[in-house]
Amino acid sequence: ENMTDRSSVIFGNKMPDKVYKKAVKSKKKYIKKFGDDSKKNYEVTVEKNRYIGDSLGVYNILVGNPAENAHYDVNAHAEKGTFDTEKGIIVGNIRMGFGHYRISMAMASAAKAMGYTPYWMDLNSYGETTCTKVIGAQNDLYSLGSRLSKNPIFNKLVWEPMNYEGFRALSYNAADQKNAELMAPVYRNVPKDIPVIGTHVWPAQAAVHAGMKYVVNAIPDNWPMALHLSEGSVHTIQCHNSYMGYRILNGMNKDKVNKPMPSDSLVYTGHYIDHEIVQGIEADCEARIRRKENGEPMRFLLTIGGA
């Protein structure tokens, strides 16, 4: 399978040779560490999710040996499923932190409410694959950095600049795209016509590399960063003020004016919120107003976590 290279040119912006070489080097480093399974033909099984299978109609996609899948429990005897190529939607995630997980749940909830079958594809759960090993290594690094950032000096000199400027650069996306090529094999035996919604950029990038035909990249952050680019997919954003920043790739190549994202690659969709919360908005607001008028305490529903 010949993948289209997504690292040397990003939305028409040519990367310097040294950036491209660094990206290739990054991929080689991971191959050396975790192996290259691009020729592997992993079996794929579908089974009902034990936790949100009944409530949200979610099915897990297991890749490779089920025993090496984080979501598999041999004693659960979960109901087996099949791929619904007419009404199926894959929610691709990496189980990284609360924010991404919450958004994944919201996507599954909205899909079910609209009559679709949501499939849960956690790229960080396939123990025998290079994909999961690469994601695990990057998650560990991010987690370590996050914990170290409690130190004000580390936070000021390393963590904040990396989060605000490092992740913002197109050069970062070039390396990510090369690494994401190593994640593509998990999609090999997944029907290519089923739409994929990535709630993290890696499942979206990997899906595009693997030849999935309809890929949505649900961007969680409103601060425009090249980290969140997955060329070849439709990017969605949650608020108006980030639209132009992403569209013109603002500040992603230092002071240079970049070629923009094509208009059909970016869509303002509004907030990623579970159907169960949205459907009660009017009644809930009326109840809040009633409570206020009666002098009762105000109550808030807050989700605590990243995105």
Q: How should each PLM-predicted stretch be described?
A:
Residues T4-N69, M105-P185:
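Conserved N-terminal ligand/cofactor-binding loop architecture of enzyme catalytic domains
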Residues A70-E86, P185, M225:
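A short, basic/flexible loop-to-alpha-helix module at the beginning of a structural domain
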Residues E79-I89, M212, E293-F300:
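A short, charged/proline- and glycine-enriched loop
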Residues I94-M105:
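A short, glycine/small-residue-rich beta-strand->loop->alpha-helix junction that serves as a flexible
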Residues R95, G127-V134, K178-Q238, S242:
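Conserved nucleotide-sugar donor-interacting segment of glycosyltransferase catalytic cores
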Residues V134-Q138, E231-H235, Q279-I289:
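Short, surface-exposed amphipathic charged segments that create phosphate/polyanion-binding patches used
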Residues A210-I281:
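Active-site-proximal region of nucleotide-activated glycan assembly enzymes
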Residues T269-H271, G280-D284, R288-A307:
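Active-site donor-nucleotide binding/catalytic segment of nucleotide-sugar enzymes
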